[in-house]
Amino acid sequence: MACPGCYNYFGRTITETPQVLRFAAGLRDRFGLEKITVGGGDPLTRPDIVMLLKGLHDLGLQIHLDTVGTAFLGAARIRFMGTGAVEQVAADDVAALSDLIGIPLDGSTDAVQQQFRRHATIASQLAVLSLLEKAGARICVNTVVHSGNTGDIAAIAELLSGFVGIVEWQLFQFMPIGPLGHRNRERYLISESDFQHAVAIARDNAPGHVRIAAKSAGGRKHRYLLIDSAGLVWTPEQSQETVWHSEDANDRRHLIGNVSDADILDRLAALENAATEVPA
């Protein structure tokens, strides 16, 4: 278990890249999709990740890639779904195809970092940042703010000062959703006020060239359409209100279909229309 606070559901198969690209093209043409985030798990464990990124790039989409980044340094173990190892992925190739590469940093020491992200060391994360900077990547550091690292935000900010390639620091309030995030919620829950205090510390201590992006739990409701490796399209099951409610903390999701379904775009259109209807 690599991340006991993870919100995600992990597919047990991998959808073929041409199918993913057809779906992405459909989202672009029908709904005006402009940006896509490729995440996981860790997308670098996908055998044809560079081919997938090139296909998305050729569609004219803005690509954000979120990865632990270990495979940039050498062969890396597969820690999410599956076993074995993945070969080293060339940072230069990924940087050339990605508009922004997000690397997690959830603490300034291994003791803090590994409360949330078990197998990533600070040394390895800093090595990944250095490698991406040399590759000319635009880098974003992602920090999940939880009860175990609120006192470490200033120290994390100090680590960022050594990298001019970091353009953004995203701070995410821990969300108690998904199979793991909900199960382990008591270990990580943080109030809105404590989150905003952590954001203020980040703004006060971050290097001047780094933009701070604060992502509260309530602010992320109903903002994402998620797709797992098997092609299942889903959203978290949450109340319609824009603020966070206690019932939003659950391990349920709303399954919409699969990217291979012939009517998947129609289903998404129906959901979009239902969400925009205003009662008389």
Each model region followed by its residue ranges:
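Structural preference for beta-strand elements that scaffold enzyme active sites
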Residues: K35-T37, Q62-H64, L100-G102, R138-N142, ...
